[in-house]
A protein has these predicted regions:
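N-terminal pre-domains immediately preceding structured catalytic cores
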Residues: 1-175
Length: 175
């Protein structure tokens, strides 16, 4: 969880004292019928798994949707982006008028909610408005804080991003 000084926007090291050790990136036993490469989001336990096969998975700690913003079902990665522009959906602007100033898009950077890497979830060719994104706020890992998107520490998200091609299946379990 060290610094990433060579990124377009240098990413600071993670203060690991702000993360429960159980949420640190790890390889674990994980029995599933899903094929290797599948991403499984477990919002109840604040984990994202990347199935590796042979009963193993890479497990990442995550933040998830707060009460009333959780969803579940199957999706797939329809798009990937490094240092994306963030545009709040109309529904978010209605709930949080202070984000209206970003209706035309928020420039990439460390303050951008989508961070350094984002995987966009699609169903039937349509963007669901949900993402797997990177965060530089370790204190949010293991909590329900978002409007339904799933956040991983930047270093973890970069690892997952690099291993995940467009078209990868994503299974979001019930909370």
């Amino acid at each position: 969880y060290g610094p990433l000084p060579d990124e377009r926007f240098p990413v600071p090291a993670v203060n690991v004292n702000k993360i429960n050790p159980k949420y640190r990136h790890n390889t674990v036993r994980y029995d599933t019928r899903e094929v290797a490469g599948t991403i499984i989001v477990d919002p109840r336990n604040y984990y994202v798994y990347r199935v590796e096969g042979d009963g193993m998975a890479t497990r990442y700690g995550a933040n998830v949707g707060r009460a009333g913003f959780l969803w579940n079902g199957d999706a797939y990665i329809g798009r990937k982006a490094e240092w994306p522009v963030w545009t709040p959906p109309r529904e978010m602007i209605a709930r949080q008028p202070e984000v209206a100033k970003y209706a035309g898009g928020m420039a990439p950077g460390l303050d951008n909610p989508l961070g350094a890497r984002t995987l966009y979830l699609y169903q039937d060719g349509v963007y669901t408005l949900y993402t797997l994104y990177s965060t530089i706020m370790p204190e949010t890992i293991g909590k329900g804080v978002t409007s339904g998107c799933v956040g991983l520490l930047t270093q973890d998200m970069m690892d997952l991003y690099d291993k995940t091609p467009v078209g990868t299946k994503v299974v979001v379990l019930k909370a």
